[in-house]
C-alpha cells in the first residue's frame, strides 16, 4: 500500500514485533521532502527479518521513492530511478520502544502499572505486554495513562482486590476497570504510605497493610484504619526504610531508624509483638517468609 513506509536495516525485524509501538528519531525524511510524519511514535504493521512497515501519509513532494541514510547524508531516489537528491544529516536513525520513568510499579489484571512523580501521571502498559507503554490503536488492549491532580510525590504502589493502588503520603488513588475506555480513577484524602515505606505494602487475607506517617494502616476496600494504636507513633515516623511481609496471618514489619526493629502484628488477635531477629530485607512466597541481612 502506498500510504505505508518500509524501514530496512540489518536485523531490524528481530528487535520488534507486529503491533509494537516504536519511536523513530533522527530520520531525514522531512528534510528530504519525503514526509514530516516518520519521526515520532509509529505502529509496526508488518515485520520481516531485516525490515518493518509503518504507516506514513503521503505528503512530501518526494514521498514515492527510496531514502538511504547514514550518519553523514541521506540519499533519495525515485521509484523509477530517474530522480536523485541528497541532503546532509547530523544524526543516525534510532528506533525504540519507549518505557516511561516509573517510581513504583505493580501488576494488576495482566498489566504492569506504574507512576511518575515528575509528571504526576499513572501509566499502564499494553495488555499482556510490558514492553509497550505508548500503544494507542483504539482497542481494548491499548496502553493507558492518566494525570492525577493531587500534590506531592508518589510513595508506593500495590494491587489488592482487583484495584491498582497508588499512594502519596496523604492520598490514595484507586484505578479500576477492564479496558482503557472504562478505566476510572478515584482519589481519597487519607493517611497514605510514608516516605521510604513503599516496601511496607503487603496484602494479607484480602487486606492491604502499610506504614503511614501516622502508624501502620489496614485497607480493606473502604477507608484505611489504624491498627498500631498500641505502639508509640513517634517511633514509627521518619523511617529510613520499611519492609513488610506476611506469614500465617501475621504481618511482619521491619523498620530502620536510628536502630532496626522487627514488629509482628497478629491480624486475627489484633496483637503486636517484637522479634529479636532484625533482618534488613524479607519476602514471602509459597507459604514461607524469608528474612536475610
Locate predicted features.
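Small/polar beta-strand repeat architecture
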Residues: 1-98
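Residue-level detection of beta-strand scaffold positions
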Residues: 21, 102, 142-144, 207, ...
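Surface-exposed acidic, glycine/proline-enriched linker/cap segments
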Residues: 89-91, 137-144, 246-250
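N-terminal beta-propeller domains
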Residues: 85, 96-174, 257-265
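Beta-sheet-dominated scaffold domains
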Residues: 110-111, 150-293
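Predominantly extracellular/luminal cell-surface or secreted proteins
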Residues: 25-27, 55-57, 78, 123-137, ...
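Generic recognition of cysteine residues
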Residues: 5, 56, 78-81, 85, ...
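Surface-exposed ligand/attachment interfaces on beta-rich extracellular proteins
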Residues: 9, 30-34, 95-99, 147-151, ...
Amino acid at each position: 500500500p502506498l500510504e505505508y513506509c518500509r524501514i530496512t536495516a540489518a536485523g531490524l525485524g528481530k528487535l520488534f514485533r507486529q503491533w509494537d509501538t516504536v519511536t523513530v528519531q533522527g530520520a531525514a525524511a522531512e528534510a528530504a521532502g519525503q514526509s514530516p510524519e516518520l519521526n515520532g511514535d509509529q505502529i509496526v504493521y508488518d515485520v520481516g527479518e531485516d525490515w518493518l512497515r509503518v504507516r506514513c501519509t503521503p505528503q512530501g513532494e518526494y514521498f514515492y521513492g527510496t531514502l538511504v541514510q547514514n550518519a553523514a547524508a541521506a540519499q533519495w531516489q525515485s521509484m523509477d530511478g530517474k530522480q536523485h537528491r541528497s541532503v546532509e544529516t547530523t544524526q543516525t536513525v534510532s528506533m525504540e520502544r519507549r518505557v516511561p520513568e516509573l517510581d513504583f510499579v505493580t501488576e494488576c489484571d495482566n498489566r504492569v502499572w506504574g507512576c511518575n512523580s515528575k509528571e504526576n501521571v499513572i501509566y499502564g502498559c499494553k495488555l499482556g505486554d510490558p514492553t509497550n507503554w505508548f500503544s494507542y490503536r483504539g482497542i481494548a488492549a491499548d496502553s493507558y495513562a492518566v494525570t492525577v491532580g493531587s500534590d506531592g510525590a508518589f510513595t508506593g504502589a500495590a494491587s489488592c482486590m482487583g484495584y491498582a493502588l497508588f499512594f502519596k503520603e496523604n492520598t490514595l488513588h484507586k484505578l479500576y476497570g477492564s479496558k482503557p475506555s472504562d478505566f476510572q480513577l478515584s482519589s481519597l484524602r487519607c493517611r497514605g504510605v510514608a516516605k521510604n515505606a513503599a516496601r511496607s505494602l503487603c496484602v494479607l487475607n484480602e487486606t492491604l497493610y502499610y506504614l503511614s506517617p501516622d502508624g501502620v494502616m489496614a485497607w480493606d476496600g473502604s477507608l484505611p484504619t489504624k491498627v498500631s494504636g498500641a505502639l508509640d507513633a513517634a517511633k514509627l515516623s521518619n523511617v529510613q526504610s520499611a519492609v513488610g511481609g506476611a506469614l500465617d496471618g501475621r504481618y511482619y514489619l521491619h523498620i530502620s531508624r536510628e536502630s532496626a526493629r522487627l514488629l509482628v502484628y497478629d491480624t486475627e488477635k489484633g496483637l503486636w509483638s517484637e522479634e529479636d531477629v532484625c533482618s534488613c530485607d524479607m519476602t514471602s512466597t509459597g507459604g514461607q517468609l524469608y528474612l536475610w541481612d
